[in-house]
Amino acid sequence: MRKLCLDLGKKTCGFAISDVNQTIAIGLENFFYEEYHFYEVINRIKYYLEESEFQGQVDEIILGLPLRMDLSESKTTKMVKKFATVLAKNITLPIRLQDERQSTKNAEAILSQGGYNAKQKKLKKDSLAAQLILEDYLERQHHEKSN
């Protein structure tokens, strides 16, 4: 089964998905929506779960949790937690929160090193951040299984 990962923001949501063996994370898209219109994100998640080529293949949602460097919560952390609560009422899959500190900055650095300009970075950074979050999650899961 696959894992679907989200990097949620106020106006964009990066999506990534794992392979069926849960070893590789693949960026899917930067989804743009009206500010704070999270039902649009929920509808997009339902699309991936029910209508896309991944229909019936996802067993868990991974949601990036933007903690501060000292692990305290920010306004954005609270927004993501509230979204997770609403999402749980709309889907039956388990939702896991994954520390996403520095994921967007790391994604921007990778894109800069790749020669992407500002406009190109804007179109790719959130899906790449979701991919990095999912890679961290998968790595942690494999590490826990091997111990």
From Swiss-Prot:
Keyword Hydrolase in record: yes
A biological-process GO annotation: rRNA 5'-end processing
SUPFAM superfamilies: Ribonuclease H-like
GO cellular component term of the entry, any: cytosol
One Gene Ontology molecular-function label: nuclease activity
Gene3D superfamilies registered for this protein in UniProt: YqgF/RNase H-like domain (3.30.420.140)
Location within or outside the cell: Cytoplasm
Stored NCBIfam families: RNAse_H_YqgF
UniProt name for this protein: Putative pre-16S rRNA nuclease
